[in-house]
């Protein structure tokens, strides 16, 4: 026991409170418009850690269709981050936004890591947003929110996917995953609203609602035309052939189509998502997606 100069026991110093991690609060914005007979990125606000490439022209048969890669310059999402991405497709714009690789979600804390995506799609516009999977590391606590506002006549493909990975190979689970989707009219009327939550232990446990699958993906198709290629059995067959378990359903209020895919791992999920995406992309845009180097 430590003694003070007057031979009395010293009082222990009060413990310093443990503060929760403070994450980044960042908002990026992309606006695509029709100009000069093609699609141009008319406005961009891309602060760190967001990074984008220039718009590529990868469709010789549809030179007005732009492709843009969205990248992370920081190595993923970290504890208590709150990143927001706004994308607007103005009338007549046709754009495909993708990523260069999957995004790692690192160990979190009590406050979730948040990723919000807000899309505004005008009439006669086409937007395809299909990022690579979010990769949940052990202890990751992630909340994902996607909000889509679509005018009548808008066409869109929006995908979202998650997979688990333990760098030590010990099958340690993530902490928690929250997913939210809202599709609304320009007047604010909600057409679709979904919310889901699952703990990592339940995700990988013996009674998991995922069964033995460890990767999950969704696809929303808005403004889908009457096209035989979009029939549920054909889409399921394309994805199932890649090793996924696939469900296709009509969204409420005539909003479009909804697809859900389960897979044993992220690689299989990506293959199944890509197989379905190619079919839907061609049906909505009139051309197949360009080959994207990653």
Swiss-Prot record:
Primary localisation category: cytoplasm
Statement: the UniProt record of this protein carries the keyword Transport: no
Source species, domain of life: Bacteria
Protein's cellular compartments: Cytoplasm
MF terms (GO), sorted A to Z: nickel cation binding
Keyword set includes Chaperone: yes
Keywords: Chaperone, Cytoplasm, Nickel insertion
GO CC annotations, alphabetized: cytoplasm
Positions of the UniProt region annotated as Disordered: 1-20
Role: Required for maturation of urease via the functional incorporation of the urease nickel metallocenter.
Similarity-based family: Belongs to the UreD family.
Quaternary state and interactors: UreD, UreF and UreG form a complex that acts as a GTP-hydrolysis-dependent molecular chaperone, activating the urease apoprotein by helping to assemble the nickel containing metallocenter of UreC. The UreE protein probably delivers the nickel.
Name of the featured protein: Urease accessory protein UreD 1
Organism placement in taxonomy: Bacteria, Pseudomonadati, Pseudomonadota, Alphaproteobacteria, Hyphomicrobiales
